[in-house]
Amino acid sequence: DDRIVSGYTYDGVVIPQIMYLDGNRSAAIRDDGFTLYKGSQIPKEVETIKVDKEIVSTFYDDNIIGLVFKNGDKDKPYTMRGYSTDGSLKFEKKFNIPYTTIKASGGNILLYNSSQISVMNSRGVEKYSGTVDGTISDFIKTGWNRYLLVLDNGVDVIKLS
């Protein structure tokens, strides 16, 4: 029983993550960028974005694919690039947030570590940054400017104005 509908060979490339953006589009995160595919029955490669820096983090949702690199800058050691799901660059931003987790959630980019959170919009503009009492386990957007902050000692709902 062969259930393979499509296959591609990429010599010298590692693809650690594949995600479905919707029923018709998917993306493969590569060690040198990402490749976009279209088609629900037989996915076809439509766009490949290559980068010449080492990718340290990735994030995505239905509308954005993000890559983070180290850039060697002492003041702002990370560069974030956000791409639309058609492969066009939406923004590039240098930042210095000491994050351990980055993800896209509800049209925002959420960065956090055990005690700090940062919320950016889909263009990389910071909407909020702060510290919390307790150890952060998870941070999720739940509604219009509402976020769920899961801590080791409980759960908080945060509303940004």
For each feature predicted by the language model, list its residue ranges.
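Short beta-strand elements that form the blades of beta-propeller/WD-repeat-like
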Residues: 17-30, 34-36, 60-75, 101-119, ...
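Repeated scaffold domains used in trafficking and secretory/extracellular systems
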Residues: 7-24, 50-63, 94-107, 134-146
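Surface-exposed loop/turn elements that mediate protein-protein interactions on large endomembrane-trafficking
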Residues: 1-11, 30-50, 75-95, 115-132, ...
